[in-house]
Structure formats: C-alpha cells, structure tokens
C-alpha cells in the first residue's frame, strides 16, 4: 500500500504573497527546505497530491492564464529535482459558496477514498491554515500546520519529513481466544529491558533473549490455559509476536532484511532469516529431554513456526550440542541476533527488486 501526502500549495510549497494570489512569475518563491524534505519523503515511498483553494480562479479578478504560467513553472522546477505530483486538485470557488470541494471539504477526494491501494494510516496533509488541519481531520489522517508568520503553526519541512519518514516502528497486538489472552508491545527503534510474563518462567527467559539480543523494547503479557498444557500459550505467543513484528515493520523500507551463528559453550546455533513476506520455517536439531524447565522441547520449533507464519518470516534454524538447555537458549539467542541486523534501518530503499515485501 502507498502512503499519500496531500499538500496545500500557497504558503506551503511556495511563499504566499500579501495579496494571496500568485499570478505573476516574479511572485514565485519556494518555501525553505521543501525540496529536500519532499525528496526524503519520496524515498520513503510517499506520493504527493496538491490540494489547493484558489478563490475565484477563472474570474476577471483572477484569470486562468495568470495562474497557469507560474503554476506550470513551479511543477517543472519540482520535476527537475526529482519530485512529481500524482495529482493537482484545484477548487476555484469563493469562500461564501461553501462548496463541498473547497477545503476543509473533501469533495475532491472521491476517487482517493475509493482507492484501496492507499495506506491511509501513514498518509498525511501539510498546509499553512487551520482549514488544512480540518481537511486532514475529515480524511482521518495526520495533519501538519506549517509554521508561517501569517497563520502560526509549529512545523517546518525538515520536521515533517522526519516525523513521517523516520516514524517510530512500534506495534501493540492484543490476541484473545478461548484459550489465551496475550498482549505484545514492541518498539524496534528503542532498546530497553524486556518485560515478559507468560506463566512459564523458562519460556519467559527465552523470550527475554529476543528483546535483549535483538536490541528492541519488548513487552509480552500472556494468560493461558496452563492447567491443561503449555501448547496454546506458547503457540499463541509466537503468533502474537509475529503479528507485532509484521505491523511494526510496515512496508519494510530501509531494513537490512537478512540476517547469525551463535555459540553457547558446547552448543552451536545458526539462524538465517529473511523478511520476505513468504513464511517458511526449517528446523534442524534434536532434543533428548522432554522438557527444559517448564517448557516442552517439542514446542520449541512450534513456537518458531508460529512466529514465522504470523510475521511473514523465512527462517532456517539449526542447532547442535549436548546440553538441551543450552540448545534451546542458543536457538532464541541466534534468532535475536539475526533479527538485529535484519531490522536495522539502513537507508530508505526497499530491499527487493519486486518493489514489495
């Protein structure tokens, strides 16, 4: 899905003159830092749509010919710098007309509201007036009021680009079934002590390894039917954690994608993974004991398979050694250490020739 940044024109892309009409070439001046900000957002996957009110455009007081020349030059300059606009939507009514197509109305948005390829959760609106923020509210998207001497506001273009392109990768997943109630919170861009409670102390310790050695904040709270057995709790925790990883990663733009071999005394574990969007799990290893602590060893590969299914992860996990405790822990640590480079931001490009992950 593609996020859209809807952008006001006068006062947002180009400076607004005292008479509020850019009807001559000499009035054309760009707002500071707009071009580098739009380039950053373009590289983060955004498309741009201009939405502008032009009072009485086409009337004797504001002839269309006076508007078209400067507007075309503006678009040409943006295009010369690598910035193109998906659409330019213009309302030509007067304020007193109360036209539904005039911002903050969303009458010009009909086609976009029907477009299921738009990522509305990441989309936004940038403008210099309160009506632009109201327009954003009407679309249920995030609004940014650009700071200007005329209308106030608190944002500049670098700040807007940072807020959208470098947005924190967080997720909260609540998974409730008849057998379990599980809540997972994570922040891929913040290191913090993991907080884990599943009712299975050894499983808690293993999950802590994922947050600690993966380098991200992780909180898992699980209640399950442990009076029956551990299966549902371990399986559903894997599914909830996988779903949270998928949600936090978004379109995966900028991630390392791939990623570890980890020794632990006599044990060696190897985790090779790919956030390909095609879940697949291969496990090579054997456990001699039926349980390690309160965790059945047969559920160790089952947890990882559940994680892969929910996150869209391709994981090949191998482990060999003599001590089953070491082998189980090495599996979790190897996954975590493989996650660290795979989740790390390494720019803005999508690591795929297909254009999607």
Curated annotation (Swiss-Prot):
Keyword presence, Cytoplasm: yes
InterPro entries: HAD-like_sf, HAD-SF_hydro_IIIA, HAD_sf, His_synth_bifunc_HisB, HisB_N, Histidinol-phos, IGPD_sf, ImidazoleglycerolP_deHydtase
Pathway the protein takes part in: Amino-acid biosynthesis; L-histidine biosynthesis; L-histidine from 5-phospho-alpha-D-ribose 1-diphosphate: step 6/9; Amino-acid biosynthesis; L-histidine biosynthesis; L-histidine from 5-phospho-alpha-D-ribose 1-diphosphate: step 8/9
Gene transcribed to yield this protein: hisB
Record-given protein name: Histidine biosynthesis bifunctional protein HisB
Region spans: Histidinol-phosphatase: 1-168
BP GO terms, sorted: L-histidine biosynthetic process
Predominant subcellular localization, coarse grouping: cytoplasm
GO-annotated cellular components: cytoplasm
Active site: 8, 10
E.C. number(s) listed in UniProt: 3.1.3.15, 4.2.1.19
Catalyzed reaction equations: D-erythro-1-(imidazol-4-yl)glycerol 3-phosphate = 3-(imidazol-4-yl)-2-oxopropyl phosphate + H2O; L-histidinol phosphate + H2O = L-histidinol + phosphate
Signal peptide interval: none
Keywords, comma-separated and alphabetical: Amino-acid biosynthesis, Cytoplasm, Histidine biosynthesis, Hydrolase, Lyase, Magnesium, Metal-binding, Multifunctional enzyme
Imidazoleglycerol-phosphate dehydratase: annotated segments: 169-357
GO function terms (MF aspect): histidinol-phosphatase activity; imidazoleglycerol-phosphate dehydratase activity; metal ion binding
Required co-factors: Mg(2+)
């Amino acid at each position: 899905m593609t996020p859209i940044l809807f952008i006001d024109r006068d006062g947002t892309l180009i400076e607004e003159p005292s008479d509020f009409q850019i009807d001559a070439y000499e009035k054309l001046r760009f707002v500071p830092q707009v071009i580098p900000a739009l380039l950053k957002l373009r590289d983060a996957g955004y498309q741009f749509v201009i939405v502008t009110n032009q009072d009485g455009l086409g009337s004797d007081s504001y002839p269309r010919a006076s508007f078209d020349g400067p507007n075309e030059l503006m678009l040409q300059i943006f295009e010369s710098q690598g910035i193109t606009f998906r659409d330019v939507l213009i309302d030509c009514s007067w304020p007193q007309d109360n036209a539904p197509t005039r911002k903050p109305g969303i009458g010009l948005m009909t086609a976009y509201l029907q477009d299921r390829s738009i990522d509305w959760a990441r989309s936004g609106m940038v403008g210099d007036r309160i009506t632009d923020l109201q327009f954003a509210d009407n679309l249920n998207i995030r609004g940014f009021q650009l700071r200007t001497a005329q209308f106030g506001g608190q944002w500049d273009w670098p700040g807007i680009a940072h807020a959208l392109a470098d947005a924190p990768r967080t997720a909260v997943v609540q998974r409730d079934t008849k057998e379990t109630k599980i809540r997972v919170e994570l922040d891929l861009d913040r290191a913090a002590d993991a907080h884990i409670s599943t009712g299975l102390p050894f499983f808690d310790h293993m999950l802590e390894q994922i947050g600690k050695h993966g380098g991200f904040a992780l909180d898992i709270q699980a209640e399950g039917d442990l009076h029956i057995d551990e299966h549902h709790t371990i399986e559903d925790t894997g599914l909830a954690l996988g779903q949270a990883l998928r949600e936090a990663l978004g379109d995966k733009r900028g991630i390392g994608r791939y990623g570890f071999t980890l020794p632990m005394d006599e044990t060696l574990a190897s985790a090779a993974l790919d956030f390909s969007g095609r879940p697949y799990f291969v496990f090579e290893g054997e456990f001699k004991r039926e349980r390690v602590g309160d965790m059945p060893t047969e559920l160790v590969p089952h947890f990882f398979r559940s994680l892969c299914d929910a996150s869209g992860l391709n994981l090949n996990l191998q482990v060999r050694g003599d001590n089953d405790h070491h082998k189980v822990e090495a599996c979790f640590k190897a996954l975590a250490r493989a996650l660290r480079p795979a989740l790390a931001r390494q720019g803005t490009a999508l690591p795929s020739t297909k254009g999607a992950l």
